[in-house]
Structures are given as structure tokens and as C-alpha cells.
């Protein structure tokens, strides 16, 4: 481990067990503040607006702009998907009505029947 993280000169042994058992506990003379002070980013993890507080102001503005871009992209993609869906449904309904219109108009005329009977 990192020698600055654990103070090897002040490690305590547990129940007389030597070796690596004390190394896992660390130095008990240091308080919680010392352990937390060694880690970077002592600020809270999130600000009140939901943006990660550990970011620099430039990174915060970049993060906000990325979130805004993602939101706009999602709205536009949903608009396109629903537009294609409703346009397709509308075209399907129109084509079905046109097919029904053509089917009703395709009936044999009386002249064709008379010509067929006249040949026999």
C-alpha cells in the first residue's frame, strides 16, 4: 500500500497477532478527519441543483450544456418517431379506402357478358 496512506510506524497489533493483521487496521491514533482529509474532493458529491459539485465551473457549464443537448435530442427523436408512425397510419388508412373504392368499381359491364354469350 501507499506509505503515506498508512503510517507504518504507529500500526497496532490485534490480540498479539503480528504480521499483516495490524496493517489492515491502520493507525488508531488518527481520527476520521485525517482519513477523509487524505482523499481529494472534500466537497459534497452533489450540489442543490443536482450538478456534481466536484466539477470546476467550466466543467459544470459543459455538463449542463450536454444534459440540455441530450434532452433536446430525445424530444426531437420522439417527435420524428411519432410523426412517422402517424403518417404511416394515415397512409395505410387512405390506401385501404382507395383499394375498397377500386374494388367496388371493378365489376363486369353488361356488354362484356353479352359478347361472351354471343360467341357460343
From Swiss-Prot:
Keyword Membrane, does the record have it? yes
Q: Which domain of life is it from?
A: Eukaryota
Q: How does it sit in the membrane?
A: Single-pass membrane protein
**Membrane spanning segments where?**
67-87
Q: What is its main location?
A: membrane
What keywords were assigned to this record? Membrane, Phosphoprotein, Transmembrane, Transmembrane helix
Species annotation: Homo sapiens (Human)
Cellular-component GO terms for this entry: membrane
What is stated as this protein's family in its record?
Belongs to the reprimo family.
Q: Where in the cell is it found?
A: Membrane
- Residue list for modification Phosphoserine: 109
Query: What protein name applies here?
Result: Reprimo-like protein
Amino acid at each position: 500500500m501507499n506509505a503515506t496512506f498508512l503510517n507504518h510506524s504507529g500500526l497496532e497489533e490485534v490480540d498479539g497477532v503480528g504480521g499483516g493483521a495490524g496493517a489492515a487496521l491502520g493507525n488508531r491514533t488518527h481520527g476520521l478527519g485525517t482519513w477523509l482529509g487524505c482523499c481529494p474532493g472534500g466537497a459534497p458529491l452533489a450540489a442543490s441543483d443536482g450538478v456534481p459539485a466536484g466539477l470546476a465551473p467550466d466543467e459544470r457549464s459543459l455538463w449542463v450544456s450536454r444534459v440540455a443537448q441530450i434532452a433536446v435530442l430525445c424530444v426531437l427523436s420522439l417527435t420524428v418517431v411519432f410523426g412517422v408512425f402517424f403518417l404511416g397510419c394515415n397512409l395505410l388508412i387512405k390506401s385501404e379506402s382507395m383499394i375498397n373504392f377500386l374494388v367496388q368499381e371493378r365489376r363486369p359491364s353488361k356488354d362484356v357478358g353479352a359478347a361472351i354469350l354471343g360467341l357460343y
